[in-house]
């Protein structure tokens, strides 16, 4: 493709960039010379919503959201569950908190993935083609959640083929072609 997903993976340090730098929180980080400490600090302020949800199949929606808070952020379980329930409510999935991924539609699974991202209180959320794995009739529910986040001022870096959506909710649109 044109390098959209690779670009997202590079700004989240999931892949090594050949050159350039990232400006985050007013500070410039050269890709070729960034410390593990700086990467960890940036990741604490970001969240990633993957194309194929990346939910744990053996965990409920609630536990998919709490897992990273408890294990990764060392948050007490009761606090993690409070944050997870609030995030699930925000994306319209609180009533499905005890459902497993196989019991949810693709759109519902992606909304759980968005709740997982929101629960970390990120400054920016990276979205990698969040609707590409969805049936067309389910795309609207995910875009609706993202539209609401944009209205609330959430900073998002979105890789998408939904050009109308991108134009309507974005401050800036970058069209990538040929890497």
Predicted regions and their residues:
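ABC family nucleotide-binding domain
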Residues: 1-178
């Amino acid at each position: 493709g044109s390098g959209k997903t690779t670009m997202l993976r590079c700004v989240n340090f999931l892949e090594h960039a050949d050159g350039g730098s990232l400006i985050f929180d007013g500070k410039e980080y050269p890709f070729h010379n960034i410390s593990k400490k700086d990467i960890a600090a940036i990741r604490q302020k970001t969240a990633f919503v993957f194309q194929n949800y990346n939910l744990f199949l053996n965990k409920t929606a609630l536990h998919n959201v709490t897992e990273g808070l408890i294990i990764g952020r060392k948050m007490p379980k009761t606090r993690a569950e409070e944050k997870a329930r609030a995030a699930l409510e925000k994306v319209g999935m609180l009533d499905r908190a005890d459902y497993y991924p196989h019991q949810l539609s693709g759109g519902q699974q992606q909304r759980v993935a968005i709740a997982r991202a929101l629960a970390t209180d990120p400054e920016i959320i990276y979205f990698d083609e969040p609707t590409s794995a969805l049936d067309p009739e389910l795309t609207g529910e995910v875009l609706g959640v993202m539209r609401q986040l944009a209205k609330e001022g959430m900073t998002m870096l979105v890789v998408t083929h939904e050009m109308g959506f991108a134009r309507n909710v974005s401050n800036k649109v970058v069209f990538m072609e040929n890497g």
